[in-house]
Amino acid sequence: MENSHINESILSEEILEDQKKNRIDHMTYLPGMEDIGSDVMDQVISAMNAYDYEKYTEVDVRRAIAHDIRTPEDFAALLSPAALPLLEEIAQAAQAETRKHFGNSVYMFTPIYIANYCENYCIYCGFNCHNKINRAQLNEEEIEKEMAAIAKTGLQEILILTGESRSKSTVEYIGNACKIARKYFKVIGLEIYPVNSDEYAFLHECGADYVTVFQETYNSDKYETLHLAGHKRIFPYRVNAQERAVKGGMRGVGFGALLGLDDFRKDAFATGYHAYLLQRKYPHAEIAFSCPRLRPIINNDRINPMDVHEPQLLQVVCAYRLFMPFASITVSTRECARVRDNLVNIAATKISAGVSTGIGSHVDDIEDKGDDQFEISDERSVDEVYDALLKNNLQPVMSDYIYV
């Protein structure tokens, strides 16, 4: 799938030509990037390239549904087109698996965007370095104000996000944000640019519990056409980020492809298989999935997940649940309230609330506010999401961790 609408640039031809002349090899590590010598990426890419989802039949899908423990081959069948007519049965099996391992619990959190400076040129992202948006970075006093305001809502888990700029959002800056967060929250996640294992160790010491890294797409050729400049262009460094995070002591790692960038079935398969391999290699690591679809961004409203409709999204979420029954699954505010409520009733176990993707959006007295990364569809407050969960006979959980 080409998705030519994604490749329509918002830049001038002159800038594009300059970028092309100076483009670096996306498969070669840059100086300072840690190579951990892992073979996980090669296994994932090999399996994804061999994945022919058209070969699976209804018999294969029913066999996968019936199994108590699903193999990668079962996972492949559950993601195939042959599974769509059986989506109701798959959803019922996924719901049963969710209740078995999580009961009615749904974990609540919110993201906090502390900076939106970025050094990458990813043509589908609102933060990309050539997009003319308002840039901002919170100082420590502003971070504390934002976090104090969020904590008053009752939330006990926070996800700290920055744009991917090492020069603006240094590892030390992010570490200080983690230390501030530890005053207010029991669980702290990070969604930042990938770093080396010793830097993940430093951030863990500062209070971070888990790291989420979106690979966006596992098709390295497509990846190269979407990430034209910056450190994010280096494909293998990003693929191996979760393993470096585990080596650095992080308790959990999250995986996600941006569904709609490329062939979503292959990307979903690669995402699940990547997590599966790391779970087998590091049994102690907590695994999480996020399932975002493309959304329009500032200055480019043509970006949409053209072939990933709600049934396909449900199929992916349920396949993750059946393949990795203990994994946490988050559904983004990129989805509307109805879709999110349905998914947490079936297979998702984590939901964000009171979300803003802008900088300094939780308090009124921060003057230098930055623009949003993407458009959100579910703008409900913490109380509204909490009440919606209760109405669906689900139990909102703020945290299940106690630090001693």
Predicted segments — roles?
Residues C129-E144, I150-V246, R251-F255, L259-L261, ...:
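Core AdoMet radical
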Residues Q95, T110, M147, I174-C178, ...:
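Generic structural signal for well-ordered alpha-helices
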Residues N116, E164-S169, L259-F264, I298, ...:
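Short, small-residue-enriched loops and turns at beta-alpha junctions
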Residues N196-E205, D262-Y276, C336-I346:
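Catalytic cores of alpha/beta
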Residues A94, C122, I160, V213, ...:
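Conserved, mostly hydrophobic/aromatic
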Residues I69-V106:
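An N-cap/entry alpha-helix motif that binds or orients negatively charged groups
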